[in-house]
């Protein structure tokens, strides 16, 4: 079910009422997919802003999105209001589209890359963002996914292991750990090479 404005408003009220003397409050909008309910996100941000002065609070927002439904209007709102943005993509096209399948059976890669590039290109330099991927047993060579994202122009990158029931074919098991440790060594060498060339990458 999609969260209603009323439920979100009660959550914000609860946060304010139980935050004591804390001035800075963090609110994260994430999955499901916030862009499916973006009007509610906009209204909740507006409501939270109205509560800042009366309660001596300051809200900071983060949104996590898979990027499929992002419009220019959403991007402008996100870049204005969201302190941090997490852009979900798993790396190379074949890796991303194996796990992120749309209703019509196609993958999301070709749709989200242009959306993410527009968002990042328009994002103010003083606001945070990063692309965030998940690696599975299917792509234990995930250093290649990190480099693929970097080559696309994304220099703020996080890639983390999937959490899944061991019975799932894509689940990571203890037997995979030596391979994963080796891959992190490979990744660290690739990142160091970029930095040695005087370029920026944050992982």
Whereabouts are the PLM-identified features?
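Conserved alpha-helical substructure of the radical SAM core
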Residues: 1-76, 80-81
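Glycine-enriched alpha-helix->loop->beta-strand junction motifs that scaffold or abut catalytic
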Residues: 79-85, 153-156
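Conserved radical SAM core fold
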Residues: 31-36, 67-72, 84-106, 136-137, ...
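Hydrophobic/aromatic residues located in beta-strands of well-ordered beta-sheets
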Residues: 27, 61-63, 85, 129-131, ...
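A conditional alpha-helix N-cap/helix-loop micro-motif detector
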Residues: 8, 67, 109-112, 139
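Radical SAM enzyme [4Fe-4S]-AdoMet core and its adjacent flexible, acidic
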Residues: 99-110, 117, 121, 125-203
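Active-site-proximal cofactor/substrate-binding loop regions of enzyme domains
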Residues: 4, 112-115
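A structural micro-motif
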Residues: 25, 59, 83, 126-127, ...
